[in-house]
């Protein structure tokens, strides 16, 4: 059991680092689990990869609790109004995922949750990040404050989030890319991605957990500990990564992540080719 818990810690670190950076946590977990794989059933592993996101979500809620809490003591009437408006934008941005991503999730997972499609998605969106950043160089963003983001923009960002239904896309990558295309600053894009992740990832993790049990699966005590340890690790690592990204985007663009995605995608393609041959 100790070895399984050590693996859970390692996978929790991978989740915490890659969930909020636009690099695809799914792609990383699949690559890492080729070498560091939990000795558990396939059904458990599929559920594990999603449910440990709860730790990452709780990190967002911890860091931004005062900003996201409309009942926070000391907030003015205007502050409370802005908080409710922010939540309204988040809810509106969730609508496309509810209407499109949820019904199609199982189909995309069955047909695209493999190394080659994930590698291609990594490369395609890596190129997109580099292209968008080069295109926007010298152009001032139109939206530099979340309070000034329109509901229409929030809805369109939600449409971009639907693209993350393709494994390897990266939920944060799709929403950040969409927000920048729609004229937001990098800071606004990152912040809204964090907030949008709360209901999206809570809902997705909840659906995966419910489906796991409805399919007749159960959890033994070892699996409970594995989920708990990985989620707590993802939470602690996410606290650091979220703060890093919010500071990073104030001085840098996302080009470096574009190159990283291309390199990782190429590595996955080479690895898939080698395993196919041998």
Curated annotation (Swiss-Prot):
GO terms for biological process: cell wall organization; peptidoglycan biosynthetic process; regulation of cell shape; response to antibiotic. It is found in: Cell membrane. GO terms for molecular function: undecaprenyl-diphosphatase activity. Keywords: Antibiotic resistance, Cell membrane, Cell shape, Cell wall biogenesis/degradation, Hydrolase, Membrane, Peptidoglycan synthesis, Transmembrane, Transmembrane helix. It is a multi-pass membrane protein. It holds the Pfam family BacA. It is an enzyme of class 3 (hydrolase). It catalyses: di-trans,octa-cis-undecaprenyl diphosphate + H2O = di-trans,octa-cis-undecaprenyl phosphate + phosphate + H(+). It comes from the Bacteria. Its EC number is 3.6.1.27. GO terms for cellular component: plasma membrane. The chain crosses the membrane at residues 44-64, 84-104, 112-132, 187-207, 224-244, 254-274. Belongs to the UppP family. Catalyzes the dephosphorylation of undecaprenyl diphosphate (UPP). Confers resistance to bacitracin. Bacitracin is thought to be involved in the inhibition of peptidoglycan synthesis by sequestering undecaprenyl diphosphate, thereby reducing the pool of lipid carrier available. This is Undecaprenyl-diphosphatase. It comes from Streptococcus suis (strain 05ZYH33). The gene is uppP.
